[in-house]
Swiss-Prot record:
Domain of life: Bacteria
Name this protein carries in UniProt: Ribosome-recycling factor
Alphabetized Pfam families for the sequence: RRF
Keywords associated with the record: Cytoplasm, Protein biosynthesis
CDD domains, per database record: RRF
Taxonomic source organism: Salinibacter ruber (strain DSM 13855 / M31)
Encoding gene, per UniProt annotation: frr
Length: 189
């Protein structure tokens, strides 16, 4: 089948773009949106027996109220290190350690802080779009090389480039939708 290598390139580009969008999704989850969410602590690491360990491996994290996160360590001896890890993550949160669990009150966001968070979200979206464009560029170059090497017609090249652009547009729309959704969450008082 003459267009198999081209289809492989398109599939690979689609996969890589999806990975970029997926990474953006996880980044946006860690950006605070007014109410408490365990995802806010997703990137926190804790020193546990001499190595940096993700928080979710040493404690359970829950948000029993819209303005409170509770961290329940699996090992009580790790509670101080967990508290230190949360402070080091520089999330602007003040954990309260009662010896058994850590309570983290989530203060309401000021208008200024909301705008900063929206800007951070926009930056993440722009980084993702740049990544998608770079993947498109690389795939386009690969397609051109295959077309030249296999002596395919110009029509095959244009068709493949159109398909690649459609894939790119779909992922870019997803990024825009995620950004819009996050902006609404942040600005919703």
């Amino acid at each position: 089948m003459p267009d198999d290598p081209i289809q492989d390139i398109l599939d690979e580009a689609d996969e890589e773009m999806e990975e970029s969008v997926s990474y953006m999704r996880s980044e946006l989850r860690t950006i605070r949106a007014g109410r408490a969410s365990p995802a806010m602590l997703e990137n926190v690491t804790v020193e546990y027996y001499g190595s940096q360990t993700p928080l979710e491996q040493v404690a359970s994290v829950s948000a029993p109220q819209p303005d409170l996160i509770v961290v329940q360590p699996f090992d009580r001896n790790a509670i101080e290190n967990i508290e230190r890890g949360i402070m080091k993550a520089d999330l602007g949160l003040n954990p309260n350690n009662d010896g058994e669990k850590i309570r983290i009150p989530i203060p309401p966001l000021s208008e200024e802080r909301r705008k900063e968070l929206v800007e951070t979200s926009r930056e993440r979206a722009e980084e993702t779009k740049i990544s998608i464009r770079n993947i498109r560029r690389d795939a386009k170059n690969e397609i051109q090389n295959v077309v030249e090497a296999e002596n395919f017609s110009e029509d095959v090249l244009y068709g493949a480039e159109e398909d690649l652009q459609d894939i790119t547009d779909a992922h870019t729309e997803t990024v825009e939708g995620l950004l819009e959704q996050k902006t609404e969450q942040i600005m919703d008082v």
